[in-house]
Amino acid sequence: MFRVHLMEFCLLFMTGRDLQQISGNDTFKVGYLSSREIKELVPSFELQQKYHDLGVPTIEDILKFISGSVRQVILDVKVGPPLYEKGLAGSVVSSYTKLGCKNCVVWAKSDNIPRDVLRLAPDATVGYIVMMDPSTGTRTQLLRMRGAWVVGVYHPLIDGKLVKVLHARNKKVYAWTVDDEESMKKMLIERADAIITSNPSLLKRVMQDAKTQCLEDGFSLSA
């Protein structure tokens, strides 16, 4: 999954954490700087030692590199300064259409973004986010947005009942962000359709262990 921010002149793949690491300033947010200022940042000595040729890619850079080698690319669109939602959906659609990305999924915490994407590109694959509402402490509405076939659900909220409800509406359940082994196992048991993680090596091992256990117990699994 890649996070997309709209800057003054281009779409960048970057999180606030990325910017803080590169700049060495833990108060920076992506919207505080222009795209030119971000690209001119000099990474810390420690980062330069650990990684070579550091830079901030655009959406076109990433899609050219990754879209042909994975089953699906999730564009997690972040709304923020300086432009907020203005022109954001159009920029995303223009970028992935230009590169012929047929396996892109667009979602955002703001429902306006995927709705605007669908309006501009009716055949696009979009999703919406289900999480805990920080202002009320309750789960955001589960069934909403006509035409969205992917639902990104904050993984502690996922159980068999939630999966059953969404599957009954032909919606896929994508669990985010699952980085510990026990939660990964739970998502497999609950039949989440996809697991978003920052630790793909661990997830691969957990899935292989589950497959091995099923085979030992006499179940046959397709690849």
Regions found by a protein language model. Name each.
Residues M7, D18-L19, V30, P43, ...:
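Hydrophobic pocket-lining residues within nucleotide cofactor-binding pockets
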Residues F2, F13, V56, I62, ...:
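Hydrophobic aliphatic residue packing
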Residues Q49, G127-A223:
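C-terminal active-site rim and adjoining tail of enzyme catalytic domains
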Residues M1-Q21:
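GT-A fold catalytic core of metal-dependent nucleotide-sugar glycosyltransferases
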Residues T15-M131, R146-W149, V153, R169:
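Metal-dependent phosphodiesterase/phospholipase catalytic core, i.e.
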Residues L11, T27, Q141:
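Short glycine-biased active-site loop of nucleotidyltransferases that positions the nucleotide triphosphate
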Residues C10, C101-C104, C214:
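Generic recognition of cysteine residues
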Residues M1-M7, I74-K78, M187, D193-N199:
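Short acidic catalytic loops
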